[in-house]
Structures are given as C-alpha cells and as structure tokens.
C-alpha cells in the first residue's frame, strides 16, 4: 500500500486522484448513468454512490467520536461481513440525485476530508490508536483509513469508469 511522508503529500494525492476520477464523469449522460456494461461491476451511478457512502462514513465516524458518541464501524446497521447490504444502502441513499448533484456532493466531501486532514497533527494522522473508530485488530493509523476510502478507490474506480465508457463506445 502506498505511504505518505506527511499530510501535505496525502492531501496532494487525494486532490490529484479525485480530479482524475471526477473528470471521468464528463460525457456520461444522465440517462446512461444506470447502464451496466459487460465486464464492469458497477454502473456510473453505483460507482459514485459507493464513493459518497464511504467518504460520508469516514467523516461521520470522526464527527461522532469528537462528539463523544460511540462509533460502530462500518455502521450500526451493517457489519463488515455484510458489505453488500451496505453498498445497496449507498445506492438507495443517492438514487434520487442526478449525476451532477452527486459530483457536487463528492467534491464537498473531499473538501471536508482535506480540511479535516489539515486540522490533524502528525501523531493523530500517522500513529495507530489515535482514534477509537480506527482502532481495529489491524491497528491502522487514521491516514490509512483515509487512503482506502479516497485515493485507492479513486484510482480503481476511475479505471472502471474508463472501461465502462470503452464498452459503451464513448471513449
């Protein structure tokens, strides 16, 4: 897994990968966003809803812990062994939003994540055990949770969007 020397490097990678990911939605028509293509496991609609769901959860875990509210990851309703149900809840949550509205929501959430990272000191960001919600048997530091919910899927899902567009004949 990719690592970062400091928060500035993490922020720059998030910005870079987010912009590349977001640009892939250019040219995807609203009436095509729910089309599934062979060899691609998500529609563009599902793709961005997944991102919205995870970035929202990441921000929610932090906000709840800061308020003294106990956090159950991934959510009180879903356990780690039922991620399919969680993903479906993401798709349902954003179903009524246009693709453009979802892009704006994701842009806002990414900005919120960047502001949050900027507010953290290096110990909180890079040392395991600094947040209860991030303290799992794997003992990941906060930066790794941020990475797997931003940079990593922005890269992977950008590739999926490119494949979707190629299969659709729009790239």
Predicted regions and their residues:
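Extreme N-terminal tail/first-helix region
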Residues: 1-20
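Short, contiguous alpha-helical
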Residues: 34-85, 128-171
């Amino acid at each position: 897994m990719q690592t970062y020397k400091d928060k500035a490097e993490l922020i720059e990678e998030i910005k870079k990968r987010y912009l590349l990911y977001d640009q892939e939605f250019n040219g995807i028509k609203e009436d095509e966003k729910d089309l599934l293509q062979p060899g691609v496991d998500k529609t563009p609609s599902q793709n961005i809803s997944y991102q919205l769901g995870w970035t929202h959860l990441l921000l929610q875990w932090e906000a709840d812990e800061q308020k003294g509210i106990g956090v159950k990851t991934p959510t009180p309703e879903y356990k780690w062994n039922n991620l399919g149900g969680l993903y479906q809840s993401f798709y349902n949550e954003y179903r009524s939003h246009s693709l453009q509205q979802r892009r704006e929501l994701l842009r806002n959430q990414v900005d919120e994540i960047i502001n949050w990272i900027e507010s953290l000191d290096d110990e909180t960001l890079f040392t395991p055990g600094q947040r209860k919600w991030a303290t799992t048997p794997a003992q990941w530091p906060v930066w790794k949770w941020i990475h797997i919910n931003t940079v990593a899927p922005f890269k992977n899902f950008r590739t999926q969007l490119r494949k979707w567009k190629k299969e659709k004949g729009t790239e």
